[in-house]
């Protein structure tokens, strides 16, 4: 029987981090809608790589939101430590996930081809 612990931990961290970003961070730089698309926690629970999508039309606003997220990583880590009981509280590393923007761009291109 395979061990699904890693997947369960990833999903639990994803749910909690998303909740913290949406409801508990009070940074005025977080103006865009932010979605946690994936979380990958290392097997030794030392690091958690968090992939986020930032929905904004302005590139500078995306950068400001991403910078605000990076600066809030310590706060997020502290709250996670209080909510999730694991041996090590992982260090949070944010990565920008542009896959949703890329998919929207491809969809626009397909629509243009269909219209011709």
Curated annotation (Swiss-Prot):
GO terms for biological process: maturation of SSU-rRNA. InterPro entries: KH_dom-like_a/b, RbfA, RbfA_dom_sf. The keyword Cytoplasm applies. It holds the Pfam family RBFA. It is found in: Cytoplasm. One of its GO terms (molecular function) is ribosomal small subunit binding. GO terms for cellular component: cytosol. Keywords: Cytoplasm, Ribosome biogenesis. PANTHER family: RIBOSOME-BINDING FACTOR A, CHLOROPLASTIC-RELATED. One of several proteins that assist in the late maturation steps of the functional core of the 30S ribosomal subunit. Associates with free 30S ribosomal subunits (but not with 30S subunits that are part of 70S ribosomes or polysomes). Required for efficient processing of 16S rRNA. May interact with the 5'-terminal helix region of 16S rRNA. Monomer. Binds 30S ribosomal subunits, but not 50S ribosomal subunits or 70S ribosomes. Belongs to the RbfA family. This is Ribosome-binding factor A. It comes from Clostridium botulinum (strain Eklund 17B / Type B).
